């Protein structure tokens, strides 16, 4: 049983999905089969356990292609090979060498278009939308380099229209919530839709059963309502109070250890956090305190969030704060928000 199941058995209130409902994130194959069954728009796909069969399928299709390890892989289980050789290498890793454990691989078509994150509070068939955000997955500026857990984010996302959001609600988030109920594993908690606006409409890239990181750091500061009331309504299955959002917009930069998402060193001192302006929010992702001083202790170390009346102002404030933080082993992307600035 998962932690939510254990709490419920003990008669305790808890916000979050059951272990069964969390399968929507824990298994890519489960999520894809669910979408196929309930006609939720997503990339065409096929699931394989056999290396030869997967390789043959990739050979017949077009490159680039998307390869997803079926289970949880700490955000590293998705590969987008640009050549057939790279695809072969990745399939060997996943299916022959069991790099992430024994499992299956979902092979899906490569979609193009801007991605955005649509998080919703869900209680069975009731779906309450949060404001949109956009993450920046690649390690380096210009969207270059390997995929990471996310190097920055902003909210809202002007390039996504109200029509896009309505479509995502009516054709994706609500139907998926209803599908989970129909499948006997109703979802409660935060359902995160990783969506893409393709030339043929909004489609699902992935689902997570939790708040997204780094998106949450730019979304929740914009929440005007008391989050406790929201959690309570979902946990108790009672009507949700109206969820209100601030007009101020947000943008945040992640400061990561040099070498991330590969191997990196830890233990570098971070200076200047006590000198930042009042209206800058700093989220500690991978820091430790030793003798009253902050040190790096993870891959993604800090996220620095700025506020503004528009995204340019939020960007400039956050970037100025980032540039004033001193540490010998951190890097960051200066181009967070490039699609909208």
Regions found by a protein language model. Name each.
Residues 169-191, 208-279, 290:
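Active-site "cap" helix and flanking loop/linker of ATP-utilizing ligase/carboxylase catalytic domains
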Residues 62-84, 219:
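Conserved anion/nucleotide-ligand pocket segment
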Residues 287-291, 296-341:
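Generic C-terminus detector
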Residues 77-216:
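Internal nucleotide-binding/catalytic subdomain
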Residues 1-26, 40-49:
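A short, GP-enriched loop/loop-strand-helix hinge that lies immediately N-terminal to
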Residues 23-29, 140-142:
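Short, charged, surface-exposed secondary-structure boundary motifs
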Residues 14-17, 44-47, 65-69, 80, ...:
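General beta-strand structural signal in soluble alpha/beta enzymes
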